Amino acid sequence: MPKTAKKHREALAKIDRSRTYPLVEGIESVKSVAYAKFDETVEVAVRLGVDPRHADQMVRGAVVLPNGLGKDVRVLVFAKGEKEKEARDAGADHVGAEDLVAKIQEGWFDFDTAIATPDMMGVVGKIGKLLGPRGLMPNPKVGTVTFDVGRAVKESKAGKVEFRVEKAGIVHAPVGKASFDADKLKENLLALVEALVKAKPSAAKGTYIKKISLSSTMGPGLNLDIADVQSKLV
C-alpha cells in the first residue's frame, strides 16, 4: 500500500464520521490528522438553505479573517495616476492598466486577487472571460472594484476571503493553515460564519445554516455542531 494511502486510512480511522464535533474539538481533530509534508490549508464547507438558481437567494461577499491565511497573497491592481501610486504604496505586487491586460491575454496569471478602480472596468472587461472562470474578476460586491485601492490592497494582503454559494447551496472557503493555533482557526472560522449570516438573503426561508464541515487539504473531513458554532458568534 502506498505511504499516502496508508496515512489517509490512519487519519480516517481517527475521525468519527457518525457524530458532530464541538467547534474546538473539531478544529483540534482536523489539525491532528493533517499528515502531508506541506502545511495543509484548513477549509470549511457550509451548506446553506438557499437555492442559488434564484437571483434573490444568491449569497456572495467577502470577509477579512482576523488571523489571515498564513500565505503571501499576490495582489494585482488595475489603476492609473494617483491611484496607481496609492496601490503601490499599500503593497500591491503588480499595478498597471493596458500593459497588464496585454500580459494576461498572453496567459500570465501570477497573482491571487485582482482589484480595479471603477474607471478601469472598461479596460478590464476585455479580459473578463479570462479572469471570470478563475475567480479573479474584480467585483464591487466583494470590494474589489473601488477607488479606495489602498484599503482594498491592505485587506487582501491581510487575508481577505471572498465567498460565493455554489449550485448545490454550498460555500467553500479557507480559514487558515493546519499549523495555526486552534484559537486562531476558531476566530477565523467564526468570522466567516458571521459574514455568511450577515449575507443571508431576505428570500431565504427555513433553516439557513444546514451543515458545517471542516477538513484539511489532504485529511478527512468532519461535521461541526452547528448549535455550538452559532453559540460562539458575537
Curated annotation (Swiss-Prot):
Record-linked Gene3D superfamilies: 3.30.190.20, 3.40.50.790
Q: Which PROSITE patterns match?
A: RIBOSOMAL_L1
Source organism superkingdom: Bacteria
One annotated GO molecular function: structural constituent of ribosome
Annotated keywords = Repressor, Ribonucleoprotein, Ribosomal protein, RNA-binding, rRNA-binding, Translation regulation, tRNA-binding
The UniProt entry's sequence similarity note says: Belongs to the universal ribosomal protein uL1 family.
Name of the protein described by the UniProt record = Large ribosomal subunit protein uL1
> What is the source species?
Geobacter metallireducens (strain ATCC 53774 / DSM 7210 / GS-15)
